[in-house]
Amino acid sequence: MTYQDIHAARFLARPNRFIAQVELDGAVETVHVKNTGRCRELLLPSCTVYLEGSANPARKTRYDLVAVEKERPGLPPLLINMDAQAPNQVFREWMEAGLGEALGLPRPTLLRPETPWGRSRFDFYWERTGVSHETSVLRKGFVEVKGCTLEEDGLALFPDAPTQRGVKHLRELAACREAGYEAAVCVVVQMAGMTAFSPNDRTHPQFGSALREAARAGVRVLAVECAAAPDSLTITGPVPV
């Protein structure tokens, strides 16, 4: 996925979870933050952020904050995409290109977003029609996508805050598997260069427990990293889980 009209700015403050104040071309600008999560380890005073300009004259803010540079001692800054809508978009592009096959997710003949099942609404429902031994075979499954912006020393971690909704999704995915569907949770790591992914047990041990229980129930637990640039985000391949 790509962005248009990108500008570098200096982060100043975040008055609430929807907006931030930045310095752009020497002036203070209020911008929309495309991530309502805490992001406290990312949005630090004076850090470099990247904004996408909006052509909508009716908007209250002229820019969306979509990425940030994280300073690392002795290393170059790490560019992290923090657009909460991006993981689903790049996952869809990745699936439709057939690139999920290496991780057991087929190129779908049907890929439907925001599909309800049971008490949840999953990010994607997919079907794949094929032929085996001259017999038509229909595979079908659900995928829940989680965007990851937290890293510690090259380890990608999710979640960055407690998420009861995430726990519910994992339990529902296990129920999908029991009902005969294929099921997966895919963590889209919105940065490059990670050595592995792990559930953030320190922040939300219940999520880590639910993830392991789902895996034992047959839910695929996948993580993929991305090539992140100020104006683009693309899934590049798997990260060890």
Task: Pin down the residues of each PLM region.
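Short nucleic-acid-contacting surface segments enriched for D/E, G, S/T with interspersed K/R
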Residues: G37-Y50, A174
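Beta-strand/loop nucleic-acid-binding surfaces
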Residues: A27-E41
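Active-site metal-binding core of divalent-cation-utilizing nuclease and nuclease-like domains
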Residues: L78-Q85, V90-E96, G100-T149, K168-R171, ...
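Nucleic-acid nuclease catalytic cores
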Residues: G154-V167, R171-T203, E225
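Domain-level recognition of nuclease-like catalytic cores that cleave nucleotide substrates
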Residues: Q190-V241
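OB-fold/S1-family single-stranded nucleic acid-binding modules
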Residues: R59-L78, I235-T236
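Short aromatic-glycine-enriched beta-strand elements
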Residues: N16-Q21
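Flexible glycine-rich surface loops and low-complexity tracts that mediate binding to linear polymers
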Residues: P45-P57, E225-C226
